[in-house]
Amino acid sequence: MALERTFSIIKPNAVANNNIGAIYARFESAGFKIIAAKMLHLTKEQAEGFYAEHKGRPFFDGLVEFMTSGPIMVQVLEGENAVQRHRDIMGATNPDNALAGTLRADFADSFTANAVHGSDAVESAQREIAYFFAADEIFPRS
């Protein structure tokens, strides 16, 4: 298995519901190392830039509005097969379809307020990490 990095967001609803610690505990108990993290309140421009691939889709404006509604946590996770394993831990995008014990089953409030975001491929992880973190803000640990 390959050591990978993935990008993760704890969305405004999960931050507002004080779920940061519980979600971080799940990451660490799954074997991930959190090698970068910070709290942000996205501007409209930042959210539109991050989700640019969805511009023009019917859910875009609502997604931007939600993602700018309160603070978020952004983090870089490192571990074996990190991208796919993180997606497995998150659960289905629609929390109604998420398996019990996944982050979205446990912490989502709705389809949009689904608690977490995670990169869908190694290439998107690299792009998303670079969007929020400079190289000197990432601290690999052995």
From Swiss-Prot:
ATP binds at K11, F59, R87, T93, R104, N114. CDD domains: NDPk_I (cd04413). One of its GO terms (biological process) is UTP biosynthetic process. Gene3D superfamilies: Nucleoside diphosphate kinase-like domain (3.30.70.141). GO terms for molecular function: ATP binding; metal ion binding; nucleoside diphosphate kinase activity. Its cofactor is Mg(2+). Its main location: cytoplasm. Keywords: ATP-binding, Cytoplasm, Kinase, Magnesium, Metal-binding, Nucleotide metabolism, Nucleotide-binding, Phosphoprotein, Transferase. Its EC number is 2.7.4.6. Pfam families: NDK. It is an enzyme of class 2 (transferase). It is found in: Cytoplasm. It catalyses: a 2'-deoxyribonucleoside 5'-diphosphate + ATP = a 2'-deoxyribonucleoside 5'-triphosphate + ADP; a ribonucleoside 5'-diphosphate + ATP = a ribonucleoside 5'-triphosphate + ADP. The active site is at H117 (pros-phosphohistidine intermediate). One of its GO terms (cellular component) is cytoplasm. Homotetramer. HAMAP family: NDP_kinase. Belongs to the NDK family. NCBIfam families: PRK00668.1. Major role in the synthesis of nucleoside triphosphates other than ATP. The ATP gamma phosphate is transferred to the NDP beta phosphate via a ping-pong mechanism, using a phosphorylated active-site intermediate. This is Nucleoside diphosphate kinase. The gene is ndk.
